[in-house]
Amino acid sequence: MALVSVAPLASRSCLSKSLISSTHELKPLRRTILPTLRWKSATPSINMCLTTSNSVDAVQRRIANHHSNLWDDDFIQSLSTPYEAPSYRERAERLIGEVKEMFESMGPNNDLLQRLSMVESVERLGIDRHFKNEIKSALDYVYSHWNEKGIGCGRDSVVSDLNSTALALRTLRLHGYPVSSDVLEHFKDQKGRFACSSIKTEGEIRSLLNLFRASLVAFPNEKVMEEAEIFSTTYLKEAVQKIPVSSLSRQIEYNMEYGWHTNLPRLEARNYMGDMIHEMPYMNAEKLLELAKLEFNIFHSLQERELKHLSRWWKDSGFSQLTFVRHRHVEYYTLASCIDIDPKHSAFRLGFAKMCHLITVLDDIYDTFGTMDELKLFTAAIKRWDPSATEWLPEYMKGVYMVVYETVNEMAGEAKKSQGRDTINYSRQAWEAYIDSYMKEAEWISSGCLPTFEEYYENGKVSFGYQISVLQPILTLDVPLPHHILQEIIFPSRFNGLASGILRLKGDTRCYQADRARGEEASCISCYMNDNPGATEEDALNHINAMVNELMKEFNWELLKPDNNVPVSSKKHAFDITRVVHHGYKYRDGYSVANNEIKNLVITTVLEPVPL
């Protein structure tokens, strides 16, 4: 076993700058040439090791040998972009006005489909925030023509068609309109199967692609949506093998790869830009495309400033000295900026990245590095919420505690600007519950105890950290959340409980083998097998995946139900955070090992602009 030397943090973090400050105050360093994009190679090993934190009093510890930070601070600080120039913003503003006019120029034969296509295009291109009124007007118009058989292409259509109906079902449902999936029954044949030909024409394939996308926003007990997903999935898998490589084949592959719950809006925008000219041949797609590229690159310039701020925070806080923890702050920022591109929401993006990084640091301390005595002291210190509580902590914990304390308080200050009241008590309660759940897991590891599935699952909803990653970031948004509404979003509300449960289950299916190798035996898989003697790992995974599928439908309902009084934007941000976590777990544990998918996401959505 290897000996690993760990340099402790200073007793107090070196935070000389505001942790959440206006990005306009950040002064990025400049280079005349954009540096070649690169990352450090990562060949992670997850082995049991010994380490010493004190040269006099050696302590045996478990560590995971996570690979180091892939994105050097010097490299981050050297990034530069020309897209801060006012001329780009001025051109974008002119195009916004021209695109608004496009919402009005539609004929009676296909005006319903054209309106839906316009809404879908501006959303998929990531420019919908400029057209809120136009989108609402377009969808109100479509909904006024909706009936029990769906809709046709235009207001004068006498027959409903599957393509328009499926697109409308999905789009209207995502915007909170009360539409029933029963309309899909009208597109089945006499044998109860969705009617289609054996030829697989382009029009039919597009209809089935929209049917597939609609099926992903299913609510509980919608049998027709389950049937639609099964049928369209089979159909599209066969179709994509037969048709030539084209914009249509790429859209099929993208949608089947990412679906809805793992799709990231900025990633989709980057992907869709290459195909949308072919997707909207009957509209002036060039204007939409130019606007989308300008907006992408203008936001790219803001991303660089925010990323430099975050990298300085990480460096100045002393995290680089903690060699036993994962350093994923750049990846977390990337995920945040893939779901929120509003320039006013810097505090949300930076706050999410910082909260997630703190969660990761504490996860590595509680699960592997810290001793039981140290963890008890740290848990008590969090509950005291006072810098003097660090007196009895080991040196490396003092620095971590102070970064947590100062970051949470700084974010509470940002939240006060939006909410008009002090919200620190919400945050403290969330952190206390979170740290208690970690302590319970540490006790299971120390004692070798394996809890029941239910006990592990309920505690795991809290220890996953979803509440921490959501609460303070959404409080910084420009949407007031009074106490009674906030209670419907935060744990243990139905909405938050479903999200936390889904992520705990999904995370365990990706992490349980590596966790077990580190001596962390408890997981949803092992607890299920222990509760059900004779059950195999495959049985446990099948059971958990079935649970996730059903919980996702319930979560869809909690998110999209029309009669909810919680602001849609707040629920949407909370939902989008589940999407970024899902995305990281799509192929494997992308948070312990920054795989190629995550690296490419950083490059294509943050570091590289799109060619104009």
From Swiss-Prot:
One of its GO terms (biological process) is monoterpenoid biosynthetic process. The keyword Disulfide bond does not apply. Its cofactor is Mg(2+); Mn(2+). GO terms for molecular function: 1,8-cineole synthase activity; lyase activity; magnesium ion binding; terpene synthase activity. Mg(2+) 3 binds at residue 515. GO terms for cellular component: chloroplast. It catalyses: (2E)-geranyl diphosphate + H2O = 1,8-cineole + diphosphate. Mg(2+) 2 binds at residues 363, 367. It is found in: Plastid, Chloroplast. A motif (DDXXD motif) lies at residues 363-367. Mg(2+) 1 binds at residues 363, 367. Keywords: Chloroplast, Lyase, Magnesium, Metal-binding, Plastid, Transit peptide. It is an enzyme of class 4 (lyase). Binds 3 Mg(2+) or Mn(2+) ions per subunit. Its EC number is 4.2.3.108. Belongs to the terpene synthase family. Tpsd subfamily. This is 1,8-cineole synthase, chloroplastic. It comes from Picea sitchensis.
